[in-house]
A protein has these predicted regions:
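Bacterial N-terminal signal peptides that target proteins for export
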Residues: 3-21
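Bacterial N-terminal signal peptides
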Residues: 16-32
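NAD(P)+-binding Rossmann beta1-loop-alpha1 motif at the extreme N-terminus of oxidoreductases
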Residues: 35-82
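Active-site-proximal beta-strand/loop segments in catalytic clefts of secreted hydrolases
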Residues: 50-53, 73-75, 96-97, 110, ...
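Active-site phosphate/pyrophosphate- and oxyanion-stabilizing loops and adjacent acidic/basic residues
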Residues: 81, 120, 156
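Rossmann-like NAD(P)-binding element
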Residues: 88-91, 95-130, 134-142
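Rossmann-fold NAD(P)-binding glycine/threonine-rich loop
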Residues: 135-170
Length: 171
């Protein structure tokens, strides 16, 4: 019998949904609490966000509301003042280097075309970190790295660029 609910899904789309579920589960507060509630004392995860645009700020806001400590980074951290002031003491703003030092978990929310420069500037700082990779290569926008990711796969390309990081594809 064929499962009609998933028959129109591509394998990649199904994998993305499953990966997002596991990432959410991994970063969720302890059982018995809801995402909107603060995490119980002592269970907070320190998360560094690289790229605090639409995706990074939205996901980071949810993590702060769930009780985790989040450092939002940007090339211009002063532009994040309103965001972090509105989220309270668990949120702060800083540079990419500060986010990498701060976070036990790193969330990357920048265009995929920025990954080679990110790797060049901060590659060794990803070593040993759990890296939640939200990047998706778009050929028209991301040039050569987009072509490379299309041919070899985004996960393998990210793993090569961010060598030493424990890559989790999430989006």
């Amino acid at each position: 019998m064929r499962n009609v609910a998933f028959s129109n899904w591509t394998r990649r789309a199904l994998h993305r949904v499953v990966a997002m579920f596991w990432v959410a589960l991994m970063l969720a507060p302890l059982p018995g609490t809801a995402f909107g509630q603060a995490a119980p004392s002592g269970s907070s995860i320190k998360i560094g966000i690289i790229g605090s645009g639409n995706i990074g700020s939205t996901v980071g806001t949810l993590w702060v509301k769930a009780g985790h400590q989040v450092l939002f980074s940007s090339r211009h951290p002063e532009n994040l003042k309103q965001l972090v002031d509105g989220l309270g003491p668990r949120a702060r703003a800083g540079t990419v280097s500060e986010a990498l030092t701060f976070g036990d978990v790193i969330f990357i929310g920048v265009p995929y075309g920025a990954y080679p420069q990110l790797a060049k500037d901060y590659g060794k700082e990803f070593s040993g970190k759990i890296v939640l990779d939200a990047g998706n290569a778009v050929l028209a926008r991301d040039g050569e790295i987009g072509k490379d990711a299309r041919e070899k796969g985004v996960a393998l390309t990210s793993a090569r660029l961010l060598a030493g990081g424990r890559i989790v594809r999430g989006f």
